[in-house]
């Protein structure tokens, strides 16, 4: 779980310049220093821990959380920590309709799979050099934009976003579909579009890494709880089945041995 020391070391408290802010963020601002807003880390840590528990519980229920962050500072962290918790991600360009027109996106993912199959089964070798080159170029483009969501068979249950201002289209699509949005809120953000906000710096690399790492750890913790519950359910089910079988056996014995008597103790 994140600590105040973690937040300070990663610069989570540094907001934007005072001229670049959203007045709705006033309640999360501690003060101003040298023209920069300072975020109230007491509120940050409270929201952080609350959101951590929300994400952990969602993962324990088997829900899918989509990681989104396409700006330069966020791309590597989004990919790294989404993969660590085996969640889908978008870390390059957000294609309009990725959520609201997901059926079309799935068709594009299918095209990627077909091209890969052509490479595997030798179909690509039967094409002209130009045709093969065009397909490889298309494959590279599809991998770049859709590689992180290629295994996402259905719409996600939640969306974790780095920089909800830059990713406003993704946030808008999630809002439209009623998907909860999780996001760090810098001082230029609109808190009204985020369901589970964490006030904090969404520009510094270390801060972004901390947010992504904590969400990834929350998901893995939730998955571990889910696996544990599943094992206990299986064990309990097996135990119940054995117990019922023993009861049936004893009942059969009783029904077939009407004259059964308990032997007297021998002296």
Swiss-Prot record:
Record's compositionally biased regions (Basic and acidic residues): 223-240
Biological process (GO), any one: translation
Claim: Ribonucleoprotein is one of the keywords in the record: yes
Molecular function, one GO term: structural constituent of ribosome
Biased composition (Acidic residues): 241-267
Pfam families hit by this protein: Ribosomal_S2
Coiled coil spans: none
SUPFAM superfamilies in UniProt: Ribosomal protein S2
Family: Belongs to the universal ribosomal protein uS2 family.
PANTHER family, per database record: 30S RIBOSOMAL PROTEIN S2 PROKARYOTIC AND ORGANELLAR (PTHR12534), SMALL RIBOSOMAL SUBUNIT PROTEIN US2M (PTHR12534:SF0)
Record's protein name: Small ribosomal subunit protein uS2
